Curated annotation (Swiss-Prot):
GO molecular function: ATP binding; proton-transporting ATP synthase activity, rotational mechanism
Major localization listed first in the record, in broad terms: membrane
Keywords attached to this entry: ATP synthesis, Cell inner membrane, Cell membrane, CF(1), Hydrogen ion transport, Ion transport, Membrane, Transport
Name assigned to this protein: ATP synthase epsilon chain
Amino acid sequence: MATIKVDVVSAEEQIFSGEAKFVALPGETGELGILPGHTPLITRIRPGAVRIEVEGGNDEFVFVAGGILEVQPGAVTVLADTAIRGKDLDAAKAEEARKRAEETLQNVKSDLDLAKAQSELATAMAQLEAIQRLAKIRSRH
């Protein structure tokens, strides 16, 4: 089966680099599915889970807190603001971040504080959703 080169990079490090049969991730206007030979595309991505279907049946999961996606016919590059390997996701930390963001929303003093708190809440909620999705998938295997 045909594959596509996939790189997921955060500001701190390269999170994933390898060949994949399929990539799914949260695009700005909805879920995107990328197969080898996909039409070139550049778009923003929302916080959420990136699923990379590699040969051999194992999927790699990476949580991204937004960023940019570039698709070329033979390559997919995800430039993430923040990226965390699926195995390194921590539900307790994500829940704590959600609570902090909700508390901050109750005490906003400016539009900038409001926007920052809303962004932090959206990221924490997306991370918790990604953890739940990953847990469901792992329970099937």
